[in-house]
């Protein structure tokens, strides 16, 4: 996978940009949390809307200090960035209602699973700049691995704006749109794999006499340390693994048990199955979008 990563230090100034989230689910909340934590956009410049759940909007407004309002109360035309975060099944109707209000200069960020930039471009017309986005749940604490795929009409300046905004939530990787499924398998679903691993680390430590919370803390710090070693040393994972694996030592015994139990293959299969399911979801959406069949992949 060829990627381009832009670090936080390279991000441009936002200069009072206004951002609107169309959709107020868990994905939108994770992104809102990450952006608010980064403190690069004034809270009053961030708003969120949905079709009818005013209680949810009030909850987000209270929690994050942003503006929650119905679609009719938000001046869509004044926004610089619109983030499409509704459910994919609602995308066609939402885009239909938005297309008369969206302005040609506005940047559209889509976190709609399975829906391509082409679908949105053809739905909105006007050669709208669209960026497809795949964050993960760690966006909530500013530690997401987020992929972006650029539509046909995204200028260099708008790409920088997208990277800057999403960089508030963690690291940003620019990939080809046909790589989104495998990215989803690795990064979109990836946090769950590590939480699953942590369940067993915690349980095993507790069974051996450690306090449950202590076992969790030890395991989490170990995962964090290993991740930092990979990112800061630049070494290959097998090199770092070999460096701490002495012949007939404790690590060798543990790795042997992992291999015997199919640990490595299990990880590979988890990623492949998640990527396959991502593709299946995309295909299902294509079948239901008969008027624009062929533009969702």
UniProtKB/Swiss-Prot annotation:
Q: What Pfam family is a match, any one?
A: F420_oxidored
Q: What name is this protein filed under?
A: Pyrroline-5-carboxylate reductase 1
Question: Where does it mainly reside?
Answer: cytoplasm
Protein keywords: Amino-acid biosynthesis, Cytoplasm, NADP, Oxidoreductase, Proline biosynthesis
Family the entry assigns = Belongs to the pyrroline-5-carboxylate reductase family.
| General function of this protein | Catalyzes the reduction of 1-pyrroline-5-carboxylate (PCA) to L-proline.
This protein's superkingdom? Bacteria
Does the UniProt entry include the keyword tRNA processing?
no
* Reaction catalysis annotation: L-proline + NADP(+) = (S)-1-pyrroline-5-carboxylate + NADPH + 2 H(+); L-proline + NAD(+) = (S)-1-pyrroline-5-carboxylate + NADH + 2 H(+)
InterPro entries on file: 6-PGluconate_DH-like_C_sf, NAD(P)-bd_dom_sf, P5C_Rdtase_cat_N, P5CR-like_CS, P5CR_dimer, Pyrroline-COOH_reductase
Which BP terms in the Gene Ontology apply to this protein?
L-proline biosynthetic process
- The record's EC number reads 1.5.1.2
**Which pathway is recorded for this entry?**
Amino-acid biosynthesis; L-proline biosynthesis; L-proline from L-glutamate 5-semialdehyde: step 1/1
What is its subcellular localisation? Cytoplasm
Any one GO CC term of this protein is: cytoplasm
Q: Name one GO molecular function term.
A: pyrroline-5-carboxylate reductase activity
């Amino acid at each position: 996978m060829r990627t381009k990563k832009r670090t936080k230090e390279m991000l441009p100034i936002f200069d009072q940009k206004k951002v609107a989230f169309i959709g107020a689910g868990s994905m939108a909340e994770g992104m809102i949390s990450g952006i608010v934590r980064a403190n690069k956009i004034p809270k009053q410049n961030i708003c969120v809307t949905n079709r009818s759940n005013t209680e949810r909007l009030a909850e987000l407004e209270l929690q994050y200090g942003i503006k929650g309002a119905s679609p009719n109360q938000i001046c869509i035309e004044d926004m610089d960035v619109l983030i499409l975060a509704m459910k994919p099944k609602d995308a066609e109707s939402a885009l239909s209602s938005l297309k008369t209000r969206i302005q040609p200069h506005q940047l559209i960020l889509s976190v709609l699973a399975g829906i391509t930039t082409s679908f949105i471009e053809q739905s909105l017309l006007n050669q709208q700049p669209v960026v497809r986005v795949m964050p993960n749940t760690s966006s909530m604490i500013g530690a997401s691995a987020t992929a972006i795929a650029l539509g046909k009409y995204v200028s260099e300046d708008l790409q920088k704006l997208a990277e800057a905004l999403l960089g508030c939530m963690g690291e940003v990787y620019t990939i080809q749109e046909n790589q989104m499924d495998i990215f989803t398998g690795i990064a979109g679903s990836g946090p769950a794999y590590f939480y699953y691993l942590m369940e067993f680390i915690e349980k095993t430590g507790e069974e051996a006499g450690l306090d449950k919370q202590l076992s969790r803390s030890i395991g989490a710090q170990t995962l964090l340390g290993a991740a930092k070693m990979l990112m800061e040393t630049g070494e290959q994972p097998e090199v770092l693994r070999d460096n701490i694996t002495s012949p007939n030592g404790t690590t060798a015994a543990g790795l042997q048990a992992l291999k015997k139990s199919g640990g490595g293959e299990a990880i590979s299969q988890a990623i492949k199955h998640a990527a396959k399911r991502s593709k299946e979801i995309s295909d299902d959406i294509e079948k239901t979008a008969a008027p624009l069949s062929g533009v969702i992949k």
